[in-house]
């Protein structure tokens, strides 16, 4: 079954394995999440648990948010996300979910919002090849041809300049190197989406489970 927790990306560092290998890791700070609601097939059409992360003052919350959190005997939360595929029988409303639900060596998927890059050209945004840099070339970093004359329009799939980043991105099959329950930290091998202090969702890997079967 799927497990998950919400946290914030602290940054990257490196640690040494027992054999001396250098491992680049991303540190994620995941304070205890609270189960705010259990979604059931009878009432909602699907099964999921709703997790809340980071308290906010009641002054900054509206009445529905305060009432929803009160059902779980907790304060209103800044972030609320659902974890589908979880075994809802293992959870109760108001229960805390901590980093110790994961173990070292476990494979997870990490979801976050990618860094915003602003307005960028086709080369940086889509990885398109640039034009000749020779003196006689008439274009260097332009998108190039807009397509054939016959359609009398530009197709939607044409790679063009535009706003880059700020999108929901998931990196799959990352390995948990270390779990630190005392400091609520997860050390995950490699990089994860988003800037420092950005919200991330760590869930059990989908494809790794299929391979195991």
UniProtKB/Swiss-Prot annotation:
Molecular-function GO term, any one: rRNA binding
Gene3D superfamilies per record: 3.30.160.810, Translation factors
Record-level GO BP terms: translation
GO cellular component: cytosolic large ribosomal subunit
Disulfide bonds: none
Region span, Disordered: 124-151
Keyword Transit peptide on entry: no
InterPro entries: Ribosomal_uL3, Ribosomal_uL3_bac/org-type, Ribosomal_uL3_CS, Transl_B-barrel_sf
Keyword line: Ribonucleoprotein, Ribosomal protein, RNA-binding, rRNA-binding
A Pfam family this chain is assigned to: Ribosomal_L3
Keyword Ribosomal protein listed: yes
Family to which the UniProt record says this protein belongs: Belongs to the universal ribosomal protein uL3 family.
Functional summary from the UniProt entry: One of the primary rRNA binding proteins, it binds directly near the 3'-end of the 23S rRNA, where it nucleates assembly of the 50S subunit.
Subunit structure: Part of the 50S ribosomal subunit. Forms a cluster with proteins L14 and L19.
Name of the featured protein: Large ribosomal subunit protein uL3
Taxonomic source organism: Geobacillus kaustophilus (strain HTA426)
């Amino acid at each position: 079954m799927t497990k998950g927790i919400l946290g914030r990306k602290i940054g990257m560092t490196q640690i040494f394995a027992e054999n001396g290998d250098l491992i680049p890791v991303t540190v994620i700070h995941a304070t205890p999440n609270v189960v705010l609601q259990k979604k059931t097939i009878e009432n909602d059409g699907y099964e999921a648990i709703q997790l809340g992360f980071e308290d906010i003052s009641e002054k900054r919350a509206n009445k529905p948010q305060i009432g929803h959190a009160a059902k779980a005997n907790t304060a209103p939360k800044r972030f609320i996300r659902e974890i589908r595929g979880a075994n809802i029988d293992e959870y109760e409303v108001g229960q805390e979910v901590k980093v110790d639900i994961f173990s070292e060596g476990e494979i997870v998927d990490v979801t976050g919002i990618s860094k915003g890059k602003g307005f960028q050209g086709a080369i940086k945004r889509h990885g398109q090849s640039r034009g000749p840099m020779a003196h006689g070339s008439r274009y260097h970093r332009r998108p190039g041809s807009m397509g054939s004359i016959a359609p009398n329009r530009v197709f939607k799939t044409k790679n063009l300049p535009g706003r880059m980043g700020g999108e929901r991105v998931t990196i799959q099959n990352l390995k948990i190197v270390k779990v630190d329950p005392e400091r609520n930290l997860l050390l995950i091998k490699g990089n994860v989406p988003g800037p420092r202090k950005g919200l991330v969702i760590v869930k059990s890997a989908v494809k790794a489970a299929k391979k195991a079967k």
